[in-house]
């Protein structure tokens, strides 16, 4: 699936709920379904700066695609991590760099987050882009 197809699926899944409490429950469920990050990846270098909660993001380059893993110590943030990983993991560096992450706006995520969580979301996406830039440079 393309990044846009995945985003469209996410939008459809979130649009099934009118109430943001239900959407938060969906985020929590997504976070609970995120595989635990191996302790060896919970390092300072994998810690995302700009997040109020502790968020770790690990990226591996496998067969030309970036595989992301992540975790957070906060349940809603862990759901956000899971959501971003669902959309971007398993794609090439160029696909990630070219992606317009419109689902964030369409599901209303950014406007329903506190300013610090919103900043954390931006920091997570920025870090994923930095990984994509680094892995793309290795391709050349």
Which residue stretches match the model-derived regions?
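Alpha-helical support elements that line or immediately flank enzyme active sites
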Residues: 81-91
